[in-house]
Amino acid sequence: MTGKQLFEFELHSDVLIVTPNGPFIEFRDNDFRNAYNEAYRLLSEPGTRHLLVDFSNLDYFGSTFVSLLLRLSQKARACKGESALCHLSDNMRGMLKTLMLLENPKVDFSMSSHANRDVALQYLADVTSRTNEKKQ
C-alpha cells in the first residue's frame, strides 16, 4: 500500500464526514478493518450523531464496502442520527437501490442520497433541528 489512507475523516457540527479514497484494490483487508474501527470510534464520540459519506473520490465499490457502510449506518441510527451520501455515481446509486439500502423507509438503516456535500449537510442539520424541536 502507498501512504494513502482508505478514508479521510472530518467533523462538521454533529456530522462525521467520511470520504473514501479509491480505488479500493490498493488496500488490504486490514486497511478496511482499521478504517472501519476509526469511523466507528469517531461516531461514538459524544455529540456526533450523523454520518455523511462523500463519494467524490470513488467510482466503484464492492460488497466489502457495502457491509462496512451498513454497519456505520446502523451505528449512526443507534446514535439517534441518520446517514447521508453524496456524489454517488449512477451505477452506485442503482446498486444501493437494488440492495434496497437507499431511500428505503422499510429498513432502519436507510440512507439518503444528495447531489453534493453542502446539500447533504443542510439535510442533516435540518434533521437535527427537527429533533431538537421535538425535545422542547
Regions of interest found by a model, annotated:
Residues M1-T2, Q136:
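Short, Lys/Arg-enriched, disordered terminal segments
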Residues T2-E38, F55:
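STAS-typified acidic loop motif
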